Amino acid sequence: MRYKSLLQIILIVSCFLFTTIGFGCSNNDQSGKANECFDDPDLPLVEKSASGDSDLSGVSIDLVTYDAFLPPEGAFESFTAETGIQVNLLQSADTGTMVSQSVLTSGDPVADVMFGIDNTFLCRGLTNDIFHPYIPSTIEQLSSELLLDPYHRVTPVDYGDICVNYWIDEVAEEPSTITQLTSSKYEGQFVTQNPETSAPGMGFLLATIAYFGEDGWQDFWKDLRENDVGIESGWTESYYGDFIAGGGDRAIVTSYLTSPIAEFIYAPEPLETPPTAVIADSCFRSVEFVGILRGTDQPLASAMLVDFLTSTYFQELL
């Protein structure tokens, strides 16, 4: 199965999960809408050529993203110097919250561009028509495998792996497989995120479905609950709240494949090795997208920001 096809299946499954846990995939909350992820939105493309001579100096646009996103230092200042467009960063609690707020304000958005909706929440965004189609000038530089939406409502901007992390010195025995999370050895040690509001949380849920299958994943989650799993609303709350990295008392957390390296690089004192590691079979590939929010008053400036965020210059800064 080609990677693009697999990602599209993940979108459908994610949307179905939202309907089954109470989050509809369309404005009227009908559970049969999962197959509408890639329906024609019947909206015209944003065309930069139509206003190519416009002077955008002094224009200000809002970029909404999740709270853990840290823009590369000086990146937006560079964009402003080049275009005259000022970028204001609005940070939501987590991906799920960001998407939910955008669904509620679809057509009259609180921001102009969204950065960070991923493949676990994308179906919900697409079926609720929160994006305006736009083909970025950088499209030829992007991987065709990640161009999931044939109508170009979103553009891939980043990808990585969601994985269960553990603090090496704080577990009785280093876990090597996802099945061990229900062992009494790790009772009260694991914290993850609510899949209704958090992209890492949804990614971990989908990883368990992939691992245990449709007949086994619910039993696994039942066992997790009996083993005192912690559930937080978002990544920040779990990683810097419950997890040892933030002063908490839980030694296992859903985070990212790159988290051990980050712990190593940003440690207050030099380390010889990272203090954390990942459980390899818990990982789930997350693809993040950027898109122009439908109803923006600044479609041209928003399109230029999408071009910038998907440019080689910005990508090398990430």
Regions found by a protein language model. Name each.
Residues 26-28:
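Bacterial signal peptide processing site
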Residues 32-124:
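Early extracytoplasmic/lumenal segment of secretory-pathway proteins
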Residues 52, 109-114, 132-164, 179, ...:
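A structural signal for short loop-to-beta-strand junctions that line the ligand-binding cleft
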Residues 64-67, 131-140, 150, 152-156, 166-168, 179-182, 257, ...:
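Short beta-strand->loop
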Residues 165-170, 209, 286-301, 317-318:
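A bilobed periplasmic-binding-protein/Venus flytrap-type ligand-binding module shared by bacterial periplasmic
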Residues 188-197, 308-318:
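Periplasmic-binding protein-like
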Residues 207-282:
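Ligand-binding pocket segment of bilobal, Venus flytrap-like solute-binding proteins
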